[in-house]
């Protein structure tokens, strides 16, 4: 249990600088119909194209700074670009365009014999609340499930909007997970 380990660490003089709680979620059946509802006019979901790299880099940069890096870490643009190129080369990715502008992305971040892990879900802040994240999640999940594997993802508990989207899609919580930074 994370709290027990943290207590033992504190007794040894090590104090956490940050604790981030996650939910480990799974989906093994088609996304629920209600999440596949209306999407904003002008929304297109598509595979990535080579000319998307700069737009996707902007999204990946924002995603890493907002969702990945702990509070005391500094952003490394070169590492982010390398990470994005690896995603584009190795993972499945879906791009969201709104009125011709790239505004969101969702990708796999790992795979096993039986599961895909979803990660890198990000919608530009000025486009949130329009149903883009929900639509990306529904379409991407449906495409991955059609390949015969279940889905897994980690979501920060404090990201209540994302938690709500995933639950609405049919993802269920398998376990709690914590990362503690010292």
Tell me the role of every PLM-derived stretch.
Residues 1-4, 152-168, 179-182:
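Conserved beta-strand-loop-alpha-helix junction that forms the acyl-donor binding cleft
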Residues 1-40, 180:
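Acyl-donor-binding surface of acyltransferase catalytic domains
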Residues 8-10, 166, 171:
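Conserved active-site tyrosine of GNAT-family acetyltransferases
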Residues 44-56:
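A short beta-loop-alpha structural element at the N-terminal edge
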Residues 64-82:
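Conserved GNAT-fold acetyl-CoA-binding loop/helix
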Residues 81, 90-106:
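Conserved beta-hairpin
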Residues 110-118, 128:
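A conserved beta-turn-beta hairpin within the catalytic core of GNAT-like acetyltransferases
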Residues 120-125, 129-145, 164-168:
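Conserved acetyl-CoA-binding loop-helix of GNAT-fold acetyltransferases
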């Amino acid at each position: 249990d994370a709290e027990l380990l943290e207590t033992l660490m504190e007794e040894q003089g090590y104090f956490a600088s940050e604790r981030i709680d996650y939910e480990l979620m799974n989906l093994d059946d088609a996304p629920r119909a209600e999440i596949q509802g209306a999407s904003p006019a002008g929304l297109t979901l598509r595979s990535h194209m080579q000319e998307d790299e700069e737009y996707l880099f902007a999204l990946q940069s924002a995603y890493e700074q907002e969702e990945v890096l702990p509070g005391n870490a500094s952003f490394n643009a070169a590492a982010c670009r390398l990470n994005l190129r690896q995603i584009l080369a190795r993972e499945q990715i879906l791009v969201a365009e709104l009125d011709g502008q790239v505004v969101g992305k969702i990708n796999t971040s790992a795979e096993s014999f039986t599961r895909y892990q979803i990660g890198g879900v990000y919608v530009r802040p000025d486009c949130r609340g329009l149903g883009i994240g929900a639509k990306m999640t529904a379409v991407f999940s449906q495409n991955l499930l059609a390949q015969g594997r279940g889905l897994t993802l980690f979501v920060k508990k404090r990201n209540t909007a994302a938690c709500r989207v995933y639950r609405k899609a049919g993802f269920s919580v398998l376990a709690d997970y914590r990362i503690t930074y010292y």
